[in-house]
Regions:
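A short, polar/proline- and glycine-enriched secondary-structure boundary/capping micro-motif
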Residues: 92-94, 122-127
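A solvent-exposed, acidic/Ser-Thr-rich amphipathic alpha-helical stretch
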Residues: 25-76
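Short, low-complexity N-terminal intrinsically disordered segments enriched in polar/charged residues
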Residues: 1-21, 25, 29, 127-128
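Hydrophobic/aromatic beta-strand elements that line small-molecule binding cavities or substrate pockets
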Residues: 67-73, 86-87, 98-104
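Short beta-strand edge/turn micro-motifs at domain boundaries
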Residues: 102-124
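A short hydrophobic beta-strand element
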Residues: 76-86
Length: 128
């Protein structure tokens, strides 16, 4: 496992355990792009905006939310691709939406995140 894939693995571990302090350190000033069709879609900068606009609402809307990747692979000099399935349950039922997350890690720091997912499946689970 490369250093950059280990860093990204650490993000998913911190999210799964609710370790906001670690997430704040890892995501610091990250440029975060949540898919436009998502209820939380948009561009956010830094952990504060990400937590307020994505992490907080998603944990409120989706019981048992889990974004554990099935694989984390290096993709080029400074990119990492994580693929998996979002799981949990919302007002409209269970969610099982595949995702691909493209991360950029430069000099040991996460600089960018872009989300790709089936937003329709996610919205269905929320009853939207």
């Amino acid at each position: 496992m490369s250093d950059r894939t280990a860093i990204i693995g650490d993000v998913y571990s911190a999210f799964a355990t609710g370790n906001a302090e670690r997430l704040s350190t890892l995501l610091g000033d990250t440029d975060w792009v949540e898919a436009g069709g998502m209820p939380y879609g948009g561009r956010y900068r830094g952990f504060g905006e990400i937590a307020a606009n994505v992490f907080g609402p998603i944990n409120t809307d989706v019981q048992g939310f889990n974004a554990a990747p099935d694989e984390i692979i290096p993709a080029g000099d400074d990119r990492v691709l994580a693929c998996g399935t979002y799981r949990g349950s919302g007002a409209g039922g269970e969610v099982a939406a595949p995702f691909a997350h493209l991360w950029t890690v430069r000099d040991g720091r996460i600089t960018n995140f872009v989300q790709y997912t089936d937003t329709h499946l996610f919205r269905q689970a929320l009853g939207q």
